[in-house]
């Protein structure tokens, strides 16, 4: 549908409504098309049936409009109407109707739709007139169909030699169509390629994160396994020693009980006293062993430093060592660099574990400093709060 703007009042009008607008607006002498911008004086606008589309308007210099099958058929249909107007057998009333029909660019090509369109657009309600117009169209269409078969029969012989070079030129035509693509199509292709690249990057990052997390979990599991294995081994080594001590005690007690009948009566009381002393010693040894077992593993024994107990437990007291270093410093304050150096040196001296890397140790150290409320970090220094 073509739209015009009135140069007198500036109102936009459809092509069908131009005559009505001219009767209202007396100064209307020139109309300009909204799409192409051309000016039409007087009745010249009637010949302007079709205008450029939005794709042609905004497509750029090298844009070529695609031919639609419907448009081709519609143009052929309107051509047929123009040919029928020139025929002498047509009545003047029907000729006027045909002239009005030729001004439209959306004329239906089927009987029911055509007659309905005539009633609504041209306000023709007499069935006899509608039948006359349609009969003229149907006769013209049937005459054309009768003439077409011989031309179709003659085409295959002529098309055989021309088909061979068409295969060679397919590549060049495809390249030309790609070069003449729209700006919109190019933008869409770029956006699609960018989206694909973003998705690929996200997948790669996700896979790298998964790979980085798995070995850490394995390391933790291995360390826990090593600790559990060390404790089991210590218990297994301690069990035979206990059994040996019990066997030795039982043998000595048996010897004390069975040793008296072959000896003299004078030696009897001395042996019984010695046996009592031995039993007392064994009971004292057993009580000492029980006391040692009852002691907690974290409590140090008398005369032994706390640092010697740490490797057997498998843990390093980060909080205690940091506190000790800060207490030794003046005003309970020291630089982060010095504190880090001293604490990690103490860790290596106490722990025999070489699995943990320097980066992990630094991460643990920073975590202990920042999350503990007893330590206050001010710029590059750490202070112990009371």
Curated annotation (Swiss-Prot):
Find the cross-link Glycyl lysine isopeptide (Lys-Gly) (interchain with G-Cter in SUMO2): 14, 202
InterPro entries in the record: LYAR (IPR039999), Znf-ACC (IPR041010), Znf_C2H2_LYAR (IPR014898), Znf_C2H2_sf (IPR036236)
Q: Which Gene3D superfamilies match?
A: 1.10.10.2100, 3.30.1490.490
Q: Which terms under GO biological process does the entry name? A: erythrocyte development; innate immune response; negative regulation of innate immune response; negative regulation of transcription by RNA polymerase II; positive regulation of phagocytosis; positive regulation of transcription by RNA polymerase I; rRNA processing
- Keyword Cytoplasm present in the record's keywords: the answer is yes
Mind listing the GO molecular function terms for this protein?
DNA binding; DNA-binding transcription factor binding; identical protein binding; transcription regulator inhibitor activity; zinc ion binding
Q: Where does Zn(2+) 1 bind?
A: 6, 9, 21, 25
Give the UniProt keywords, A-Z: Cell projection, Coiled coil, Cytoplasm, Immunity, Innate immunity, Isopeptide bond, Metal-binding, Nucleus, Repeat, Ubl conjugation, Zinc, Zinc-finger
Subunit details for this protein? Interacts with PRMT5; this interaction is direct. Interacts with GNL2 and RPL23A. Interacts with nucleolin/NCL; this interaction is direct. Interacts with phosphorylated IRF3; this interaction impairs IRF3 DNA-binding activity.
Its name, as the record gives it, is: Cell growth-regulating nucleolar protein
Name the species this protein comes from: Rattus norvegicus
What gene name is listed for this protein? Lyar
């Amino acid at each position: 549908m073509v739209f015009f703007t009135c140069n007198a009042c500036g109102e936009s009008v459809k092509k069908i409504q131009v005559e009505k607008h001219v009767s209202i607006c007396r100064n209307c002498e020139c109309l300009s098309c909204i799409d192409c911008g051309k000016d039409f004086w007087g009745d010249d606008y009637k010949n302007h049936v079709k205008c450029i589309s939005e794709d042609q308007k905004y497509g750029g210099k090298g844009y070529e409009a695609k031919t639609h099958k419907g448009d081709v058929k519609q143009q052929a249909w309107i051509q047929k109407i123009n040919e029928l107007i020139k025929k002498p057998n047509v009545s003047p009333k029907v000729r006027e109707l045909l002239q009005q029909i030729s001004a439209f660019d959306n004329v239906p090509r089927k009987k029911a739709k055509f007659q309905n369109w005539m009633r609504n657009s041209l306000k023709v309600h007499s069935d006899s007139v509608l039948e006359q117009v349609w009969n003229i169209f149907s006769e013209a269409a049937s005459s054309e169909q009768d003439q077409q078969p011989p031309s179709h029969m003659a085409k295959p012989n002529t098309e055989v030699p021309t088909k061979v070079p068409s295969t060679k030129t397919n590549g060049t035509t495809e390249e030309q169509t790609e070069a003449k693509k729209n700006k919109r199509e190019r933008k869409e292709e770029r956006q699609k390629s960018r989206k694909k690249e973003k998705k690929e990057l996200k997948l790669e990052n996700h896979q790298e994160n998964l790979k980085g997390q798995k070995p850490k979990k394995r390391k933790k599991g291995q360390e826990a396994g090593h600790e559990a294995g060390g404790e089991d081994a210590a218990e297994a080594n301690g069990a035979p020693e206990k059994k040996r001590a019990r066997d030795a005690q039982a043998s000595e007690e048996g010897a004390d009980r069975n040793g008296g009948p072959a000896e003299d009566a004078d030696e009897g009381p001395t042996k019984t006293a010695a046996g009592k002393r031995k039993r007392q010693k064994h009971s004292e040894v057993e009580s000492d062993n029980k006391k040692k077992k009852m002691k907690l593993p974290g409590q140090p024994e008398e005369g032994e430093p706390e640092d010697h107990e740490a490797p057997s437990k498998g843990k390093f007291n980060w909080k205690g060592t940091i506190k000790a270093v800060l207490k030794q410093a003046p005003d309970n304050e020291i630089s982060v660099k010095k504190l880090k150096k001293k604490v990690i040196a103490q860790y290596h001296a106490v722990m025999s574990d070489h699995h943990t890397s320097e980066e992990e140790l630094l991460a643990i150290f920073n975590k202990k400093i920042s999350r503990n409320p007893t330590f206050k970090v001010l710029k590059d220094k750490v202070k112990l709060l009371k």
